[in-house]
């Protein structure tokens, strides 16, 4: 990892941990102890090797025979998160992954309660959907096009059945390849 990427990831880690430090319950008790935050700061954070469409972050258990914990995991983030317009969302994604690192493997009620501590959580969900749509647009190689109303759904895979219909107008869908201009055609 080059110095610039290291600095970006370090800054992101610092931002998230400093926010986690101030999360308190109604009795003014902190949700995350200094020890937990110190352990989180030692977790390796890097980039996903392939930019997935729907995966914005990933926590992996290093030793599958042991329980997920800060000393037994690493976090990978989608590179697209580091565009300026997504940087605040990147903080939320790292926070989400850190909750996993603290042993909260499933997205259960307890996990969601911790996740809801994040400021502007609803806005983060909107930004997350926006990022997913943008990634879908980039990766799309096929367009399902309605023969009746012209509605288009872009898809990354060719998987298609000839009996697909648009649910709004019941027009038959056609699977059309998306042809992008090459760099020589610009």
For each feature predicted by the language model, list its residue ranges.
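Metalloprotease/metallohydrolase-associated module, dominated by Zn2+-dependent proteases
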Residues: 6-84, 88, 105-186
């Amino acid at each position: 990892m080059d110095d610039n990427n290291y600095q970006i990831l370090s800054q992101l880690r610092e931002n998230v941990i400093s926010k986690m430090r101030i999360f308190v319950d109604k009795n003014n008790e902190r949700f995350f102890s200094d020890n937990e935050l110190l352990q989180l700061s030692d977790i390796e954070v890097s980039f996903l090797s392939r930019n997935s469409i729907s995966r914005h972050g990933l926590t992996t258990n290093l030793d599958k025979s042991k329980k997920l914990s800060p000393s037994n995991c690493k976090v990978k983030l989608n590179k697209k998160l580091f565009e300026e317009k997504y940087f605040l969302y990147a903080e939320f994604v790292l926070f989400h992954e850190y909750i996993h690192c603290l042993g909260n493997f499933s997205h259960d009620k307890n996990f969601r309660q911790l996740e809801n501590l994040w400021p502007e959580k609803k806005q983060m969900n909107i930004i997350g959907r926006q990022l997913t749509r943008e990634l879908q647009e980039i990766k799309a190689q096929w367009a399902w096009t309605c023969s009746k109303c012209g509605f288009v759904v872009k898809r990354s895979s060719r998987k298609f059945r000839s009996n697909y219909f648009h649910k709004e107008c019941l027009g038959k869908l056609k699977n059309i390849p998306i042809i992008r201009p090459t760099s020589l055609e610009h």
